[in-house]
């Protein structure tokens, strides 16, 4: 902003005896403080932006407004004085308006330079004095009102005399009154329209106020962010050793800065758009107000002229009547006229003065409140305009009433004169009556009627008084002209302030852009610093030199701040003097106001009543506006809900990926369990090789185990299928939800674009916020993937990639703001890609399912092969039994004696064979049943696959709809793809392991078959042992058959339960599908109703637009009364329509809310159903776990020996001893760490105390400097200042610099000592940590040795248990003892893990203490450096003031001596800075330069 001051003034010269005035053209330079004067106006090409450029041949000289101490106005000849240190400029203008223009312009320029200062306390005194003056004015107004009331009473007493004559002419007056009422109705209608506009302006001002408050908050946030950036830079310079930690801190801070800056940019853009629109509306309305006010003023002037003409005719008629009546009536009429004129003039003057006072109060508040209270200024200015408009309207109404009264009086008096001419006798009688009444009421009037001589004397006195009052009126007219000029100047000030606000907004925008550029530069600098960290480690010596250079830079900054402090002190002194002048001027103006305001009180009561009416009307319109705002808030809440839904969708995607990972982990665990079961089978087969008698039993056991495993695998397959189904159903439901939500979003966006065209900027801001949030989510996903990978080596590369991504994102945001149309196209393309990626993921899931199915098929084929092998074994057994029978028959023939015995034995053998055959037949039938069941399940799988294919088709259709939105999920999907690829690779590895295990099992089975064949040959050799084997086989076969039957029953029960659960799950799925259909229908209905509501909202907006247009037409066509009435009727009809539409909207909103409640209830039912499903799945899992436990109990019945107990007890004792050692070591390490931390805290507290003492020393130095400056400024002459200041300054500067260097060196030394102590502590801690780790490793190795020994013992016991048969009770006791000991071992392992965790926590605490210590050191060093900079700035300001004081005094002396003085002071000051000359030599150097 720039202030304009231009024009001709007469300037008095300073040379010569006779000082004449010369006409000079004055113009204010662009810098706002150099007032140049010329012989004629300079050409436009010449720029006078500064004093150095203006020192050319064109400019005769200039006046520095910053150094002006006072402006005095001389009484006569339009002369005023401008005082500057060392000189007084005597200037003369042509009239008072030019004087006021130049004085107020200079004051405005001074205030413009004082706005940015923070001296608010000085101006509080002015506000208090003005408040006191206002209170005094109110008291004086009360006195004037009392006098006015007395005069009114007198006037009323005189009016009673003429009431008899007025009764005749009441009819004529009533007609005129009706006409006046019609006019008043028109005015009231206009006033109402004005009030409505005023309320809208107030609302706009409130919006501006809120927006500017938010802007101030964001400015504060920007300042905080810049401070954080400085802290980060200092941390980089100081902590070059901690590279990894610094990188992490820099990443976090950069992310936060970018997020906050993006938000601030968006909000500032919105605020600027709102402010621009509101300014335009406000300017239009102000122009309308001004036009209406001018129309009303013209009407009032016409009415006043008519009334004056009537009064003149009345006076002429009165002069023709008798002398007595003429004298009385002339006196009365003249007094009335004078009083009315005085009241009117006083009202106008008082209103203008009140306006000036209010404007000046606003100016003072503007000076007190800096940038944060600028917004409140606009509100106050608008409120003042509204008050003035209301006052003007009230005054207009009052004047109308008075004009009506005067018209009535004039009519009455004209009729009185006519009656007097017609009947003089009646007049005489009436005069007698009037004289009698006057004698009773007024002694003065009785004396006038009785004594003509006294009346003549009184007439002469009255004439003298009239002359005096005419002189007063002339003076008041002059004052009114001055007030009008002041009003014009105040209006110019308002315009200037509006321009200031716009310029400030532009400056803030520029600052934001600068901040963005600074942040980008910081990012580039950070990337460069990361590359240079390794170089800094190698070049520690060069870093110390850089620190010294930085200290020199800090000292330069301190000098600059000292210069600023000096300039601030000079401005404070100048302000004090200017404030005193302002107080004097205000006191003078207030005295004049007190003289003018003595006859004005009745108008205040009427104004108050009308103000109350206006306030009531304003409240009614405020309520209507609040209703509209509530509607807008509801729309905004809907937008926020849509944003929340998008965020929930993203979170659901992440959760689904996590669930897939967990399921894959569970599958891997199940595979491991299966591998362990296979190994247990191998051990059981090896154990059964020793006993040939139990071959049949072992075969049956293997068959049972295979069947159980088949069942387990079938259950697992079913679980996989169910899990896949549930996951697919969940995905489908989520996709449906997403589709519905996206449809709602699309419809809401379309409706909002139609309804809220004026709020496009806010929607752009919302889009940018969503983009920032998605960027945050992307960054979080990237960070999570980095943590999973745990690859710290790739951090530097990833940082570079992130920086590039951030830059690309910034460019994308800028492009999106410029081209919104391109966004939609890019969204569609990206969503198409998303759809393809989702299809790929679904294909991958299908491949996984197919792989699982293929693995299950392979397992089934292998089981079938094993079953065939078992059948071959049974057939071999049958063949061997047949051979035995043939041999027995041969022996029968050879041995006749033993036939009977052999027959008996043969019968027994035949029975056994039959039993075996029956058992084998049963087994075969069961195997056939199992195969049938497998085929049924295969059919189920095929049907399930077909259903999956159908669902896939549906999903593809749904995904085609999703292609329209969700551009921002690309990066998330890429991360998920990478994780899925890794999981797939892990699955492939595990599948390979499973295949290897299966091959190993096949090889082991082949070996077993070969061994079995060998042992069958041995059976033929051992015929003698057949009898014993038969007996044992009988007993064992019975036991095994009973067990087998029990197992079959359990299996059948469990299968029945599983079938029941499957049926229940199917029913629940049907219910779920039905509920989903209902939800979809409800959502469609809701969409339709939302469209209807949007259409109705559009209608309401159209109607509002029509209303606004009609109101504008009413304002334009104020003269046409009939048109106004028609428009009013139309407005009322439109308002009724609006109310009806609003009621319909409310009803539809209620219906929508009810449907939303129904949807929520359905969702709750769906949740309950899902919970029931989860409970049933848990029951299935429990059944399966129970079955697994029963099998494990059968396999875990093994024999153990008492020797194991002794060894385990010894192991227990050793472990306890080592635990005690670990505990003692950890306590010692913890105590050492605590003692070291206590030492560090004590050292930090000592350092804090030292810093506090140093800050006190610095504050004392500042006080000494200020006191010395005050003492020197109070000296009388400039020469004494030269002698006294220069040596003190040199000494003080040297002392301060020495003290600063000493303080900095001490701080450096103490920082180095503390860092060395911290390094020593860290080394000790690392040593203790390494020792503890070595001890823990030793303990773990010993524990592993014990475990290996226990395993070997277990294997030996197993082999021995085959040969021995201990009692079941002893076995159970030994098993219990072993299980207890294993639990104890596990507890010990847990304790070791907990202790290792505690050690890690201690390490983390120590690292945090180190970080906090470095942060505290940096903060304190920053504080000390800031204080040093402030001291240096003060010193620089003192130097600058000293230089300019000497240079100006020498320049004045040289001018008196006749030197040329062509050299500018500012150039000399720039040279002396670079030369480094002592203070003592400055005057000599300056004088030499001036002489050149």
Curated annotation (Swiss-Prot):
SUPFAM superfamilies registered for this protein in UniProt: PH domain-like, Tropomyosin
Domain PH stretches: 2-111
Q: Where is the composition biased (Low complexity)?
A: 1274-1286
Coiled coil stretches, renumbered: none
What keywords would UniProt list here?
A: Leucine-rich repeat, Repeat
Q: Which species is listed as the source? A: Dictyostelium discoideum
- The lineage's top-level taxon is Eukaryota
State the name under which the record lists this protein.
Putative leucine-rich repeat-containing protein DDB_G0290503
Name where the LRR repeats lie.
123-144, 180-204, 258-284, 329-351, 352-375, 389-413, 439-462, 519-543, 551-575, 579-603, 632-656, 728-752, 806-830, 831-855, 895-919, 927-951, 955-979, 1013-1036, 1044-1068, 1138-1164, 1210-1232, 1424-1444, 1445-1468
* Disordered: annotated span: 1272-1292
Q: Give one Pfam family.
A: PH
Q: Which Gene3D superfamilies match?
A: Pleckstrin-homology domain (PH domain)/Phosphotyrosine-binding domain (PTB) (2.30.29.30)
């Amino acid at each position: 902003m720039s202030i304009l001051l231009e024009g001709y003034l007469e300037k008095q010269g300073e040379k010569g005896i006779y000082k004449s005035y010369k006409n000079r053209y004055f113009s204010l330079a662009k810098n706002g403080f150099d007032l140049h004067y010329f012989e004629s106006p300079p050409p436009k090409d010449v720029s006078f932006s500064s004093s150095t450029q203006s020192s050319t041949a064109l400019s005769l000289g200039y006046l520095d407004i910053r150094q002006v101490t006072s402006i005095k106005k001389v009484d006569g000849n339009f002369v005023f004085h401008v005082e500057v240190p060392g000189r007084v400029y005597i200037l003369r203008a042509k009239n008072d308006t030019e004087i006021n223009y130049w004085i107020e312009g200079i004051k405005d320029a001074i205030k413009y330079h004082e706005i940015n200062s923070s001296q608010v306390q000085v101006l509080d005194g002015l506000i208090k004095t003005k408040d006191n003056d206002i209170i005094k004015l109110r008291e004086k107004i009360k006195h004037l009102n009392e006098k006015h009331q007395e005069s009114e009473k007198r006037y009323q007493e005189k009016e009673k005399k003429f009431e008899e004559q007025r009764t005749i002419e009441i009819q004529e007056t009533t007609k005129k009154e009706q006409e006046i009422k019609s006019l008043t109705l028109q005015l009231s209608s206009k006033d109402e329209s004005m009030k409505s506009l005023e309320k809208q302006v107030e609302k706009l001002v409130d919006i501006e106020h809120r927006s500017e408050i938010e802007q101030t908050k964001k400015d504060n946030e920007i300042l905080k962010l810049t401070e954080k950036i400085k802290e980060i830079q200092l941390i980089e310079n100081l902590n070059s050793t901690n590279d990894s930690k610094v990188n992490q801190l820099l990443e976090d801070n950069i992310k936060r800065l970018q997020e906050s800056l993006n938000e601030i940019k968006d909000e500032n853009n919105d605020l600027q758009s709102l402010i621009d629109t509101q300014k335009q509306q406000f300017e239009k309305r102000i122009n309308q107000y001004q036009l209406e006010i001018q129309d009303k003023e013209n009407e009032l002037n016409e009415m006043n002229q008519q009334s004056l003409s009537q009064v003149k005719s009345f006076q002429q008629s009165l002069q023709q009547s008798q002398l007595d009546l003429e004298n009385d009536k002339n006196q009365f009429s003249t007094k009335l006229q004078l009083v009315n004129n005085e009241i009117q003039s006083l009202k106008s003057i008082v209103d203008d003065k009140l306006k000036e006072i209010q404007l000046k109060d606003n100016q003072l508040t503007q000076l007190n409140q800096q940038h944060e209270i600028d917004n409140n200024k606009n509100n106050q200015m608008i409120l003042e305009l509204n008050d003035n408009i209301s006052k003007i309207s009230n005054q207009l109404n009052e004047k109308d009433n008075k004009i009506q009264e005067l018209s009535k009086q004039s009519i009455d008096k004209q009729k009185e004169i006519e009656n007097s001419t017609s009947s003089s006798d009646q007049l005489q009688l009436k005069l007698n009556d009037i004289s009698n009444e006057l004698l009773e009421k007024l002694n003065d009037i009785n004396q006038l009627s009785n004594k003509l001589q006294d009346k003549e004397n009184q007439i002469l006195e009255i004439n003298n008084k009239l002359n005096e009052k005419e002189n007063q009126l002339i003076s008041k007219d002059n004052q009114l002209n001055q007030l009008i000029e002041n009003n014009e100047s105040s209006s110019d000030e308002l315009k200037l302030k509006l321009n200031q606000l716009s310029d400030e907004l532009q400056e803030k925008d520029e600052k934001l852009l600068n901040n963005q550029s600074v942040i980008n530069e910081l990012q580039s600098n950070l990337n460069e610093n990361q590359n240079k960290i390794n170089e800094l480690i190698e070049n520690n010596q060069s870093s110390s030199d850089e620190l010294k250079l930085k200290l020199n830079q800090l000292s330069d900054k301190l000098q600059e701040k000292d210069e600023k402090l000096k300039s601030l002190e000079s401005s404070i002194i100048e302000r004090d003097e200017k404030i005193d002048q302002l107080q004097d001027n205000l006191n003078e103006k207030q005295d004049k106001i007190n003289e003018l305001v003595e006859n004005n009180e009745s108008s205040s009561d009427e104004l108050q009543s009308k103000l109350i009416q206006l306030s009531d009307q304003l409240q009614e319109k405020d309520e209507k506006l609040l209703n509209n705002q509530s509607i807008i808030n509801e729309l905004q809440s809907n937008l926020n809900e849509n944003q929340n839904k998008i965020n929930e969708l993203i979170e659901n995607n992440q959760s689904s990926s996590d669930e897939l990972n967990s399921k894959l982990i569970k599958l891997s665990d199940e595979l491991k369990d299966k591998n362990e079961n296979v190994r247990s089978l191998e051990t059981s087969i090896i154990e059964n090789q020793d006993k040939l008698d139990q071959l049949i039993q072992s075969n049956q056991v293997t068959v049972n185990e295979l069947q159980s495993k088949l069942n387990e695998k079938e259950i697992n397959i079913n679980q996989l299928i169910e899990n896949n189904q549930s996951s697919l159903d969940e995905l489908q439901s989520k996709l449906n939800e997403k589709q519905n939500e996206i449809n709602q979003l699309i419809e809401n966006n379309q409706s909002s674009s139609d309804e809220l065209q004026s709020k496009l900027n806010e929607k752009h801001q919302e889009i940018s916020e969503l983009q920032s949030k998605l960027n945050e989510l992307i960054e979080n996903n990237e960070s999570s993937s980095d943590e999973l990978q745990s690859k710290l080596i790739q951090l530097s590369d990833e940082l570079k990639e992130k920086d590039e991504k951030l830059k690309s994102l910034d460019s994308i945001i800028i492009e999106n703001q410029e081209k919104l149309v391109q966004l939609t196209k890019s969204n569609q393309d990206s969503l198409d890609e998303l759809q393809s990626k989702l299809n790929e993921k679904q294909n991958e899931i299908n491949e996984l399912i197919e792989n699982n199915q293929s693995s299950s098929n392979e397992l089934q084929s292998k089981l079938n092969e094993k079953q065939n092998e078992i059948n071959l074994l049974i057939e071999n057994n049958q063949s061997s039994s047949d051979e035995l029978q043939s041999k027995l028959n041969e022996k029968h023939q050879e041995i006749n004696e033993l036939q009977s015995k052999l027959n008996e034995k043969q019968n027994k053998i035949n029975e056994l064979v039959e039993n075996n055959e029956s058992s084998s037949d049963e087994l075969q039938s069961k195997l056939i049943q199992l195969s049938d069941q497998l085929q049924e399940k295969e059919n189920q799988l095929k049907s399930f696959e077909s259903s999956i294919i159908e669902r896939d088709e549906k999903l593809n259709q749904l995904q085609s709809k999703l292609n329209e939105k969700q551009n921002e999920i690309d990066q998330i999907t890429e991360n998920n793809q990478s994780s899925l690829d890794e999981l797939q690779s892990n699955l492939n590895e595990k599948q390979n392991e499973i295949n290897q295990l299966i091959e190993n099992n096949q090889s082991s089975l082949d070996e077993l078959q070969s061994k079995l064949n060998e042992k069958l040959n041995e059976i033929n050799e051992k015929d003698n042992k057949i009898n014993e084997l038969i007996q044992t086989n009988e007993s064992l076969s019975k036991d095994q058959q009973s067990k087998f039957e029990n197992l079959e029953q359990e299996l059948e029960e469990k299968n029945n339960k599983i079938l029941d659960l499957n049926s229940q799950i199917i029913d629940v799925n049907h219910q779920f599908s039905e509920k989903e259909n209902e939800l979809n229908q409800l959502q469609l209905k809701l969409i339709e109703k939302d469209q209807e509501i949007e259409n109705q909202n559009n209608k309401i907006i159209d109607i509002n637009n029509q209303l606004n247009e009609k109101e504008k037409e009413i304002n334009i066509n104020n003269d046409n009364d009939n048109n106004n009435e028609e428009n009013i009727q139309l407005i009322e009809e439109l308002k009724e329509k609006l109310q009806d539409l609003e009621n319909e909207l409310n009803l539809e909103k209620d219906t929508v809310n009810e449907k939303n409640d129904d949807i929520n209830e359905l969702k709750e039912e769906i949740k309950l159903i899902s919970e029931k499903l989860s409970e049933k799945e848990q029951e299935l899992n429990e059944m399966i776990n129970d079955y697994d436990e029963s099998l494990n109990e059968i396999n875990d019945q093994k024999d153990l020996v008492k020797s194991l107990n002794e060894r385990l007890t010894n192991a227990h004792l050793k472990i306890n001893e080592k635990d005690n050692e670990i505990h003692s070591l950890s306590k010692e390490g913890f105590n050492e760490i605590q003692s070291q931390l206590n030492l560090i805290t004590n050292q930090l507290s000592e350092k804090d105390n030292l810093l506090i003492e140093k800050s006190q020393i610095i504050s004392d130095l500042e006080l000494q400097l200020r006191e010395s400056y005050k003492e020197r400024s109070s000296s009388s002459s400039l020469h004494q200042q030269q002698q006294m200041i220069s040596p003190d300054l040199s000494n003080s500067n040297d002392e301060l610099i020495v003290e600063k260097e000493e303080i900095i060196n001490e701080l450096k030394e103490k920082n180095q000592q503390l860092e060395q102590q911290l390094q020593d502590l860290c080394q000790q801690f690392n040593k203790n940590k390494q020792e503890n780790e070595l001890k823990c490793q030793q303990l773990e190795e010993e524990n592993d040795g014990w475990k290996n020994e226990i395993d070997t013992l277990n294997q030996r016991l197993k082999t021995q248990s085959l040969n021995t048969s201990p009692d079941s009770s002893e076995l159970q006791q030994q098993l219990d003892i072993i299980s207890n000991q294993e639990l104890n071992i596990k507890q010990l392992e847990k304790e070791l893990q907990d202790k290792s965790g505690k050690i890690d926590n201690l390490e983390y605490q120590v690292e945090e203490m180190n970080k906090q210590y470095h942060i505290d050191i940096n903060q304190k060093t920053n504080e000390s450096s800031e204080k040093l900079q402030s001291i240096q700035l003060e010193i620089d300001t003192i130097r600058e003031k000293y230089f300019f004081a000497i240079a100006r005094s020498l320049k004045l002396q040289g001018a008196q001596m006749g030197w040329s003085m062509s050299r500018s002071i500012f150039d000399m000051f720039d040279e002396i800075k670079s030369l480094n000359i002592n203070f003592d030599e400055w005057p000599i150097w300056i004088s030499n330069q001036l002489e050149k």
